[in-house]
Structures are given as structure tokens and as C-alpha cells.
């Protein structure tokens, strides 16, 4: 969608920003604008903010690891464009119409499935961060404690966390590895196919979503048990005057989140797009 706005004079100080809000007044995305005098044109790809996805290695040939790079597509409806130029704010309406190439598409049903997958990607992102944080903490405390029994308990906990972590996200770039469930790639793949297609998902896809949601819930339950094991070790850690375990909460995770990157420091969208076509 092209958004045009007029500036009487060139903006010499400060930034120009366009914010897209939905009908509930919620901010969907913020886009940097241009500062030229006269008519300015900014393109919005009609996508919202990407999900806060799980981290892991960038696996060659696997599109699911790019889930944190693509936001959900906005649905047809009325939106508000808020133009901010220095201390001045201007608002105008923006109407997104239905795609004439996809007549009869049930946008409401499609959006429900999209939001479900988005939520699954973010839930997994938080879970992976929590497991990784506690695993790393357990390893550090095991190296620092004097009590041999406590050290053994910490090492066992770290090993359990490591095993769970390996089922949640990719840890090895080699192909053909068997016996490992990697929810990050599997959930991410369904999310990306949903967001890069103009069609409703097939029954096999919705069945797969239900299965992966169940697997995610099982992983969350398993992690919850390990979190309790970690908490039970806190009194012993306190006796040794070491910092105790603290579970990473959602607010802290979201505040400190930065999008995962590949080895080059950025996503290779060209390869990702080839995999999705």
C-alpha cells in the first residue's frame, strides 16, 4: 500500500515516522518516512510486527527458522495512519480492500489461524529463552559450588535442560539428523506458509497445527517440572552465597528481545523466499 503525504517544507531536524494503527487504536507497525519538501511516498507492505521467535542455528534449506523475519499480513478493513514530524502529529484513514484475485476468501477464519500460529511462535520463543537461561545458569553454578551433591544435582539439571532444549530448537546444521523434534522449524514453517499464501490452509495443515500445539504444551509442561527442580535447589545455592535461579518472565523477554540473525548478521531473505515458493 502506498501512503502519500505532503510537507510544506523539508524537515531538517528530528525524524519523520508513520505509524499504522488498527480500529482498536493498537500500533501495528512503525515505518520511517522521508523528509523532502512536497509530496512524499512511503510503501507499507501491509505486514505487522513479526513474532518474537525462538533462537537457534540457521539451518540450510529450512524455511521455518525465518519465522521471526515476517509479520502477519493485515486483513481488509479500516486503519489509521499517524504521521509524526517533529512535534507535529497528523492522522488520516487508510482502507485496505479485499484481494480481487482471491474472491470468497474467509479473511476472519484465516486471521484466526494466523493469530494462533503467531502465538505458538511467540510462546516457543519465550520457552526456548527460559530453558536456555536456566540451563546456562545451572552449568555456571555447578562450576562454582563446593558441595559435591549440589554440584551433581546441578549437572543433572543442566543435562535435562540441554535435552529439552534440543527438542525445541535446532542445535546442529547437519542434515539428516534423526530422532530429534525441533518445534522451532516445524511451527515456523507452518506460520510462514500461512503468511505467504493467499489461500486457506488445508485440513492436513490444520491437523498439523493442532498436533504441534499439543507438542508445544507437552514441552511447556516438561519445562515447568524442570523449573520446579531448579527452584528446589535455591536454598542450597543461597547457603553457598551464590545467586539463585530466577525464571525469565515474559515482560523481560520481550523487553530484551532482538530478532535472531544468521551468520552474516542478517536474514538471507532471498534464500528464505526460494524455500517458500
Residue spans of the language-model regions?
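Glycine-centered tight-turn motifs at strand-turn-strand junctions
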Residues: 27-72
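Contiguous beta-strand segments within globular domains
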Residues: 1-17, 21, 41, 114-121, ...
Amino acid at each position: 500500500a502506498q501512503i502519500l503525504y505532503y510537507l510544506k517544507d523539508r524537515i531538517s531536524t528530528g525524524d519523520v515516522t508513520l505509524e499504522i494503527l488498527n480500529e482498536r487504536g493498537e500500533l501495528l507497525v512503525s515505518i520511517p518516512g522521508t523528509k523532502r519538501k512536497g509530496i512524499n511516498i512511503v510503501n507499507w507492505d501491509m505486514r505487522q510486527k513479526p513474532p518474537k521467535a525462538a533462537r537457534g542455528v540457521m539451518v540450510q534449506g529450512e524455511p521455518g527458522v525465518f519465522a521471526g523475519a515476517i509479520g502477519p499480513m493485515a486483513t481488509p478493513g479500516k486503519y489509521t495512519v499517524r504521521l509524526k514530524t517533529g512535534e507535529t502529529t497528523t492522522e488520516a484513514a487508510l482502507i485496505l480492500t479485499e484481494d480481487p484475485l482471491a474472491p470468497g476468501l474467509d479473511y476472519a477464519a484465516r486471521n484466526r489461524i494466523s493469530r494462533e500460529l503467531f502465538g505458538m511462535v511467540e510462546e516457543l520463543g519465550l520457552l526456548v529463552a527460559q530453558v536456555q537461561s536456566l540451563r546456562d545458569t545451572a552449568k555456571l553454578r555447578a562450576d562454582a559450588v563446593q558441595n559435591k551433591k549440589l554440584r551433581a544435582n546441578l549437572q543433572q539439571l543442566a543435562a535435562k535442560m540441554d535435552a529439552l532444549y534440543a527438542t525445541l530448537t535446532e542445535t546442529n546444521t547437519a542434515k539428516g539428523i534423526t530422532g530429534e523434534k525441533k518445534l522451532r522449524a516445524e511451527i515456523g514453517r507452518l506460520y510462514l506458509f500461512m503468511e505467504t499464501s493467499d489461500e486457506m490452509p488445508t485440513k492436513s495443515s490444520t491437523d498439523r497445527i493442532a498436533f504441534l500445539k499439543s507438542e508445544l504444551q507437552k514441552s511447556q509442561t516438561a519445562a515447568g517440572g524442570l523449573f520446579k527442580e531448579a527452584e528446589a535447589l535455591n536454598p542450597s545455592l543461597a547457603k553457598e552465597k551464590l545467586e539463585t535461579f530466577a525464571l525469565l518472565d515474559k515482560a523481560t523477554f520481550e523487553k530484551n528481545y532482538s530478532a535472531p540473525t544468521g551468520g552474516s548478521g542478517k536474514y538471507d531473505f532471498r534464500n528464505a523466499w526460494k524455500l517458500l515458493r
